[in-house]
């Protein structure tokens, strides 16, 4: 009898696939019964040590979507094949069930979850005695345990974790309520644990049957771990809003997540070694230890204890495995006595700060004057105060011009800023109105009417000569030129029969001197153009090149202007030295 049994399970000599006589007899039995579904299941679960053929699996997947195909009959036939004594038949039957649950109609999973039949393969041992049958029995038991846990998960949750939505927006576990989430995650953990128990080596994956089941398990693990990660993120987001019991369960869940993370990484390394594309393998990074410390500290705070100080104060958000960064760190609990001591210290520091501020204000004699200084309207009569240094420059007393000092009027600064033009009443330099134009000095009139050459400072403000921040540069240059020309003797041939009215604002008693009448046809500029030489620019030492050389007569005038500016600077330095020696003007 045993000899006949062995003969039935021996490969047939004239077949290339290694089918046995038992496989042919089973297929013939279903053919005589007219069951194409049974015949296909038998062909998909033969004793050949190779994965089920794709054409048989596709036919079974198509049958699950047909309304006239009995799902219970298909499931019962597959469960019947799992009771075969040959490990290859049992293993291939489990692969077929797993493949239909993943890619077939959901009615198949619903029937397996609703019926009470189980695989009952916890003590399976190969009875045929083929090559490696005893060693492969261990893989059969582990694989059957995972399939049974997958069916049990569907029975408890009414959905398959491998088919639910995942992600931040509409993920099932990402948007689940706290109570239901804490009850669902342990079920998912049990399924992941059953999957991770299926541990194989690289050499064992050379077997076609084992390799086929490993690929299906790898795809399930990627989907299950994605759901698991969404659930952990949801737990961490709601952790600080949970009560004490929920926080304790959530902390245990997170600790188990860290433990399973290492096992998942080991499983993925095996998958990478057998040639699975690295693009399908996720990158797993462990969360920092400070995250676990923060969760434990919050739980201790809820339980009324004192949390230990954290070992790491700052945690980068990109280091979280779950991709979630906390915006608030839980603070350790403080006793009433310690809190009162902190309050007293803060009050003492505040009192010391106020005393120090009062002492600084009392020691500064100018604090009240500066704080109370405000622009007041000008009065007709102001009392000079020799000790008031802040108001001495606000309303200067009018000084009588010294006739012997040609630079006396330069010491009085203008009350207008450099970048704002003065009013019309002070359009003339230093308040002196220009004299009427003389027929003997047409160049002098043109000099006053020439458009001013404005030079902008790098910061956008109008530049001014050094020592005269409020004086217009063109006005100063014209005055210096007039002064230097009027101090020279009148050469022969000049018309000295002019009016007795003086055009020199620097000396009221000096006789008026006519300007040199240069030929206007040679140097006269067209209307609206810039002059060839501007005394204002010559006063600053800048060179003008408008395409024509400067005449010798005007070069002499430039030298005179430079000499006058040097004398003016020397007089100003003397006045500054005298003022520093006597600060009160006595």
UniProtKB/Swiss-Prot annotation:
InterPro entries: ANTH_dom, ANTH_dom_sf, AP180-like, ENTH, ENTH_VHS. One of its GO terms (cellular component) is presynaptic membrane. The keyword Membrane applies. Binds clathrin and phosphatidylinositol 4,5-bisphosphate. GO terms for biological process: clathrin coat assembly; clathrin-dependent endocytosis; locomotion; necroptotic process; post-embryonic development; protein localization to postsynaptic membrane; receptor-mediated endocytosis; regulation of receptor localization to synapse. Disulfide bonds: none annotated. It comes from Caenorhabditis elegans. This is Phosphatidylinositol-binding clathrin assembly protein unc-11. It is found in: Membrane, Clathrin-coated pit; Golgi apparatus; Cytoplasmic vesicle, Clathrin-coated vesicle.
């Amino acid at each position: 009898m045993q000899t006949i049994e062995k003969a039935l399970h021996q490969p047939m000599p004239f077949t290339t696939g290694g089918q046995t006589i038992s496989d042919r007899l089973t297929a013939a039995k279903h053919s005589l019964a007219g069951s194409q579904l049974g015949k296909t299941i038998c062909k998909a679960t033969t004793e050949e040590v190779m994965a089920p053929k794709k054409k048989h699996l596709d036919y079974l997947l198509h049958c699950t979507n047909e309304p006239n195909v009995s799902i219970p009959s298909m499931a019962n036939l597959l469960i019947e094949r799992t009771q075969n004594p040959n490990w290859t038949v049992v293993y291939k039957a489990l692969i077929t069930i797993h493949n239909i649950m993943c890619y077939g109609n959901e009615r198949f999973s619903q029937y397996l979850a609703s019926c009470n039949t189980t695989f009952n393969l916890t003590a399976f041992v190969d009875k045929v005695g083929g090559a490696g049958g005893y060693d492969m029995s261990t893989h059969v038991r582990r694989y059957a345990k995972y399939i049974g846990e997958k069916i049990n998960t569907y029975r408890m949750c009414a959905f398959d974790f491998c088919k639910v939505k995942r992600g931040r927006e509409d993920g099932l576990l990402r948007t689940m309520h706290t109570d239901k989430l804490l009850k669902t995650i342990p079920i998912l953990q049990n399924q992941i644990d059953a999957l991770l128990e299926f541990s194989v080596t690289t050499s064992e994956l050379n077997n076609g049957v084992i390799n086929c089941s490993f690929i299906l398990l790898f795809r399930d693990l990627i989907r299950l771990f994605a759901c698991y990660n969404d659930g952990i993120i949801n737990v961490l987001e709601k952790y600080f809003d949970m009560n004490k019991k929920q926080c304790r369960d959530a902390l245990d869940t997170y600790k188990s997540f860290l433990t399973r993370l290492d096992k998942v990484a080991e499983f993925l390394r095996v998958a990478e070694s057998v040639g699975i594309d690295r693009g399908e393998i996720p990158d797993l990074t462990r969360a920092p230890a400070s995250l676990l410390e923060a969760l434990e500290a919050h739980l201790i705070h809820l339980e009324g204890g004192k949390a230990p100080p954290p070992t790491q104060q700052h945690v980068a958000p990109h280091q979280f495995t779950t991709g979630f960064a906390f915006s608030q760190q839980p603070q350790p609990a403080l006793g009433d006595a310690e809190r009162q001591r902190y309050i007293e210290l803060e009050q003492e520091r505040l009192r010391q700060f106020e005393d120090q501020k009062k002492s600084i204000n009392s020691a500064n004699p100018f604090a009240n004057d500066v704080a109370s200084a405000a622009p007041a309207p000008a009065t007709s009569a102001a009392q000079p105060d020799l000790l008031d240094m802040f108001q001495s420059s606000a309303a200067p007393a009018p000084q009588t011009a010294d006739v012997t000092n040609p630079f006396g009027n330069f010491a009085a600064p203008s009350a207008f800023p450099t970048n704002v033009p003065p009013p019309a009443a002070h359009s003339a330099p230093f308040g002196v109105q220009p004299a009427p134009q003389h027929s003997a000095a047409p160049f002098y009139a043109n000099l006053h009417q020439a458009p001013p050459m404005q030079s902008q400072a790098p910061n956008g403000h109008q530049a001014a000569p050094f020592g005269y921040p409020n004086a217009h540069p063109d006005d100063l240059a014209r005055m210096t030129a007039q002064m230097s020309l009027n101090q020279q003797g009148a050469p022969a041939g000049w018309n000295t029969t002019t009016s007795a009215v003086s055009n020199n604002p620097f000396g009221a008693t000096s006789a008026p001197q006519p300007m040199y009448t240069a030929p206007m046809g040679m140097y006269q500029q067209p209307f609206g153009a810039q002059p060839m030489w501007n005394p204002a620019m010559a006063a600053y030492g800048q060179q003008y090149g408008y395409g024509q050389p400067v005449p010798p007569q005007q070069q002499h005038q430039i030298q005179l202007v430079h000499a006058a500016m040097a004398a003016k600077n020397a007089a100003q330095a003397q006045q500054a030295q005298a003022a520093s020696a006597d600060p009160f003007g006595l």
